[in-house]
Amino acid sequence: MTNLGSGLTRRRLLAAGGAAAVAGLAAPALANTDPIRVGVLQPLTGGLDALGVQGLNGATLALLDANDSGGVNGRMFEIVQADTATDPKTCVERANDLIRRENVSAIIGPVTSANRDAMRPTIERAKMPLLYATDYEGGVCSRYITCYSALPDHWVTPMVAYANEMIGNSFYLVGSDYVWPRKMNAAFVAQVSQLGGTVAGEEYTPWGAKDFTATLRKISDSEVKTVVVSIAGADAVTFVKQFAAAGMNKEIRMIFFGFSENYLAGLSPDESEGILAPTNFTSSLTSEDAENLKGLTAKRFGTDAIVSNTVDAHWTLTRMYIEGIRRAGSDDKEAVTDAMVDQSIRSGNGEVYLRASDRHTDLNVLIAQAQGGKMEVLKDLGRISAANQCG
């Protein structure tokens, strides 16, 4: 176990990313109540490390800042960190550890839909609040799963309309071989069909793919205007590098679902130039809300810390959970589950709203483009309310 105090740094977070680690946060000397233990279950190894660290940073930022302000209801937070290893079986094992051995009051994570779906029965049996802050394909309706997640209504529908107007209506779809890319692409195909466009090809790549030559050849031969990417993690960086090395980025536009500052860190400006992505936050924003999040992140993790959509989502949802505890007057799981919904809060990109009807969030949506190694906003779509996921 590793103690992570208020002087937490990004380097120390990364170093703590193996087995479950308890972040012991010292309570004031006069405190006489037990700390509230919160599990942060993220992929800190296994190919989605960058996303996992960003999720951990966002949750940690909210919890440590709450402690610095005296905690909630006179109680401090204690972080219990665990690694899914980007593997559904491991994710379930770690979830069981957090629930049975670590006695956490809530779990923040994981990242992939495959991991979330694998652990869902465990969560619902234990009646354990799960705070899920990753974009996904939609359809989760559970009392115990609260989502700060961009759904196809947030990202796919406006992105297809934008591409149809600004680029063209022919597409080739490439994704990792799991549920999120497949269902996102199904939504994409449906939207393209409604607008009279064409999807020339659709394929899915295994985890750990190293050579995309055959896929790139098919894309080139299809003569489409746009390639749509939903490859996850390190594989996505490999794909973009090979796409650029083949000179295809000069002729074919790329829409990349989930693209953010996380990926920019692994690409040169030339390799990332022109990539389009829907997002809910980007660090190029200069609003008061964005500057607040960037300032808090720099103060906590250092000025070189990445501030991405993933950080914002986990930071905001964790603060919603903290407010739920304040409203409930305790960390009782059922009471907090009831108390944290029907809540508006300031994110890094304006006010968002957590619905009681399906425990999903109305989000502010941007269309951004990689320019000169940064994500620049092309269009601010404002707040979008997705369809009820329990309807």
Give the positions of each predicted feature.
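Sec-dependent signal peptide hydrophobic core
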Residues: 17-21
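Extracytosolic ligand-binding ectodomains
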Residues: 2-5, 9-15, 31-391
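N-terminal signal peptide c-region/cleavage motif recognized by signal peptidases
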Residues: 26-28
